[in-house]
């Protein structure tokens, strides 16, 4: 009842899966330079933090743009309402505030590798002393866009 001409056949099956890199972030502590009276007489240093979660072993770079009120040279400035009064400030990658945090890949960005868990990054901010005798009163603000490249 059997067929003696049957031969075993072998073939290969390839299993594949693709895991795309992915990152997500949210601000956990915004930059707040506090309340000041009159001219800024000395550096005001503060920090902000945000949390970044990227897929395990995914390389990433985090960049910051110059903000909504930067001048033509890219210097960051906060503005009070629609009055036009501006207050210069800067954002840095290091606690010594010597490495400006920008948006140029492999140069002024912060790079790292995802772990699959939340990683906290700190932004170091500084408002330098004012050149004039007083700073017009008001609530100064700016909006900086954070870009995550992965």
Predicted regions and their residues:
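Predominantly extracellular/luminal cell-surface or secreted proteins
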Residues: 65-67, 90-94
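Solvent-exposed adhesion/ligand-recognition segments of exported proteins
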Residues: 97-106
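Intrinsically disordered, low-complexity sequence elements enriched in Ser/Thr/Gly/Pro
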Residues: 74-77, 91, 98
